[in-house]
Amino acid sequence: MAKLHFRPYIPNQTVLFPQRIDENIAADDPVRIVNAVVDNLNLDNFKKLYKETGRSAYHPKMMLKVIIYAYMNNIYSCRKIEKLLLRDIHYIWLAGHEHPNFITINRFRNRVKEEINNVFTQLVLVLADKGFISLDVEYIDGTKIESKANKYTFVWRKTVEKNRTRLLNKIRILLEQVDEAIVQENSAKDTSVELTPSMLSNIVDELKEVLEHQPATQDKEQKKALREKKKQVRELEGYRDKLMEYDNHLEVLGERNSYSKTDPDATFMRMKEDAMKNGQTKPGYNLQIGTENQFIIDFRLFPNPTDTLTLIPFFHSFQHRYNRLPGIGVADSGYGSEENYRFMQENGIEAFVKYNYFHKEQRPRYTPNPFHAESLHYNAGEDYYVCPMGQHMNRIGTRRDKTASGYITESARYRAQRCEGCPLRGSCFKAQGNRIIEVNHRLNQYKRQARERLVSEEGVRHRGRRCIEPEAVFGQMKYNMAYRRFRHVGEDKVKMDFAFFAIAFNIKKMCAKLRKAGKELITLAKSIFIGLFITRYNGKIATCYQMNEKKAA
């Protein structure tokens, strides 16, 4: 029988010359790119976060590398990162055999919640410098992401305001029943004076002082009256505390209509992920991102669930980050408003932003309604419309409306002359009297300009790209990287967490594009800087629709 032979197996053998730990890491592994990217970032702002005295802290570059690489691998828990620092060779190499515990890792994340945003900006500028992106075009979209707050911790503005009004009425009724002199002195019976907790505290103090100086008596009726007044004072103290609670709710709400008690920065919104199919609202944030070539180039959190009011602040965020505005803005119909169109026109942004019913107009079988105001003939010189029966609809005035952002819109009002007995009245309108239409001429002009851009060759290309730009990023974020819910409480910490995710996402996307261009391009030796190694890829990636060539011309 032949003798079996096995390879030597001595797990506790001592090695005379220990091998380098990164010898077992592939040359094209993304962990090397993370190491090179962070090594070439400017982290001088991190130094102010540490004290010169005390125990030496872990190096911020090491901590940053470990966290970013963990986020690239869908690991967002500090406890899991702590375990990987003892088990995974990639994390051990990045950390240089250091073993920070989960508390230290979490403290570092919270410590750099302001500076990590600057790190994200640096990375985007590196991508722009190496030709991955141009920063001349921004594809904008938003998604609602649930907060860590509990579901049923809501505070509604309407409920608070209604209960506060009821409470004020109870307070006024109670004040009418207590000491009349104090009531008149504090003008509490004057309904024009707004009662405040501090005013009620003064009234309570004066009432207590009066009751303390009441002479002792054996009369039962006087004792009963005294007990009743003390009871009213205690009741007034309870009302004061409740009024203070309502005022605190209104202060936290600000301009919002709701917030969560366990995460005051979160607002209740309707999410796409509705398991009960009942439209239940959940606490969350409206995350707006700007992408180019499927890289995240900007992001911001908003408390309002609609996208219309987020576009202008989001452009301001881009300008603050890069000291410029994008040359082209691409977004869906949720951003198409008069205020947004006007802002982009005044700031030189070429707007490829859809408006309501744009898709309906592009259908082959679409037939415009001949009775709709936009289908009526308009004489711009004499400022009147012509109805389907040929009557002139003369202008009768202007209606002004204020949007939630404070923007004033103007709509011209036109009225027909003789609608009684018109054979088309049943199809035209069903109200009594002569028909009145309201037309926003400025918005219609912006829509015509947007339509011309969107149906052009460049507009069709941007519309096609928009579906695979932010939508693809959201898909990869939620389903491939399992980032479906925020894991922190408070807008500042949520913003910090997503900044780490955005950095990891961009590095991961860069690795994917390098692999797609050629496997040999991802060979990063320890002495090669990220700039040199990216330069080999520069020129092969298609920048955003030849924007760089257009700038050069």
Stretches found by the model and what they are:
Residues 1-32:
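Hydrophobic alpha-helical membrane-insertion signals
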Residues 2, 14, 39-41, 62, ...:
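Intrinsic-disorder/low-complexity peptide segments enriched for small residues
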Residues 3-5, 50-54, 458-461:
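A ubiquitous short alpha-helical element
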Residues 8, 67, 74-87, 98-553:
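Anion-binding and metal-coordination hotspots
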Residues 26-68, 441:
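Basic, short loop/linker segments at the boundary and entry of helix-turn-helix/winged-helix-like folds
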Residues 91-96:
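Secretory-pathway/luminal and periplasmic proteins that interact with or process carbohydrate-rich
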